[in-house]
Amino acid sequence: MLTNLRLVTLSSETSADNNGYQIIEDGMVGITNGKIMFVGSVSDSPLACHNDLHGHPDVIDCGNALVTPGLIDCHTHLVFAGNRANEFEQRLNGMPYEEMAKRGGGIISTVQATREATEDELYQLAIKRLNGLKRDGVTTIEIKSGYGLTLDDELKMLRVARRIGDMPDIKVSTTLLAAHAVPPEYKNRADDYIEYVCQHIIPAAVEQGLADYVDVFCEGIGFSTQQCQRVFETAKHYGLGIKGHTEQLSNLGGSALAARMGATSVDHIEHLDHDGVAALAANNTVATLLPGAYYFLRETQRPPIEHLRKLQVPMAISTDFNPGTSPIASLRTMMNMACTFFRLTPEECLRGVTCNAAQALGLEASRGKISVGMEADLALWDIDTPAELSYRLGVPDLVARIVDGELFYAK
């Protein structure tokens, strides 16, 4: 039992305060075999009859910590080799991306470095990046492939992601993103590459149990809606979930396509129109906001937040951690950016990195809320109010994380 805490449950079973948070003061959480078995006040707990709860061997005093669900980073490209700091300098000096690509930069430079790296090297690099997310209270993370673009290299990336998921203090959902870019070997033959993805990479990932989802980059510099539909159809044939990078730079209709085909989420969506929002609402598809990429690329077109609110589309928030457009390993920074750039409320941001992020990964029945029967994934904070998670940056507020019922103190 965890006692002497203030619970932000984000569960409809708990009444909301004036700011929309579901908070239980003087709260207690009971955990058995990694699952939450009791949520409520101390006076209602199974141990309420004990005169001295603090001395009970099964009780941990949390020091009046504020407790939220463990945070979920539902869109990352954590596994890769190399970095593109030189391109950051070049972009600031006015060099267009197209010119960088001609010089061998851009995504292809990351592909080359990732292909050359061993699995152990990729694993060690990813662990260093992951540590920053853990310090922000992250207990579940999604990791994509997409920097291999060959059968062997895409599977190599997914094996690294699965290996990270074997760690006791983090849960990992894996996504095959072979349809991320056209590799050099298939230059000017995007249709042929999509067939290679559908006929070889997806079946192999399924056979080896390496992928939970399949993702695509539906964009003018990526793949067309017809090509993405082919990938989605193949993924669904093999029983995999689908999601999409859509409407980041233009409006091709990829979000509506993905939603109609059953995607759990569509991500970026700066150029999403009202018809696209309606498609998300009709199909219960999560809109994942990626303010880090918006910031890093100095974009000006914001996602249609008001219309998403109007149609009650759940909004998730994620880092989009990647070497080219969002090298920011801090989910709390994304919460602050979502408030500042997109005008989300702190309460919307907290839901965006907990219950809505869980829904984006198809995990809403097991993670993202503090409720009986859910997995015991929690974050304990030394703060007064939940809004501080979005408001304050650079302060080590995390006390501990609990993952599947196991306690890990912040380092």
Swiss-Prot record:
Keywords for this protein: Cytoplasm, Histidine metabolism, Hydrolase, Iron, Metal-binding, Zinc
Molecular function (GO) terms for this protein are:
imidazolonepropionase activity; iron ion binding; zinc ion binding
Q: What is the lineage of its organism?
A: Bacteria, Pseudomonadati, Pseudomonadota, Gammaproteobacteria, Vibrionales
Spell out the subcellular localization from the entry: Cytoplasm
- Reaction catalyzed: 4-imidazolone-5-propanoate + H2O = N-formimidoyl-L-glutamate
Output the Pfam families linked to this UniProt entry. Answer: Amidohydro_1
Q: Where does 4-imidazolone-5-propanoate bind?
A: R84, Y147, H180, Q248, T325
Protein name per Swiss-Prot or TrEMBL: Imidazolonepropionase
According to its UniProt record, the EC number is: 3.5.2.7
- InterPro entries membership: Amidohydro-rel (IPR006680), HutI (IPR005920), Metal-dep_hydrolase_composite (IPR011059), Metal_Hydrolase (IPR032466)
EC top class, in one word?
A: hydrolase
Function, please? Catalyzes the hydrolytic cleavage of the carbon-nitrogen bond in imidazolone-5-propanoate to yield N-formimidoyl-L-glutamate. It is the third step in the universal histidine degradation pathway.
Binding positions for N-formimidoyl-L-glutamate? Y147, N322, G324
Which residues of this UniProt protein bind Zn(2+)?
H75, H77, H245, D320
Which cofactors are named for this entry?
A: Zn(2+); Fe(3+)
List the SUPFAM superfamilies hit by this protein, alphabetically: Composite domain of metallo-dependent hydrolases, Metallo-dependent hydrolases
- Species assigned in the record: Photobacterium profundum (strain SS9)
Family to which this protein belongs = Belongs to the metallo-dependent hydrolases superfamily. HutI family.
Chief place of localization? cytoplasm
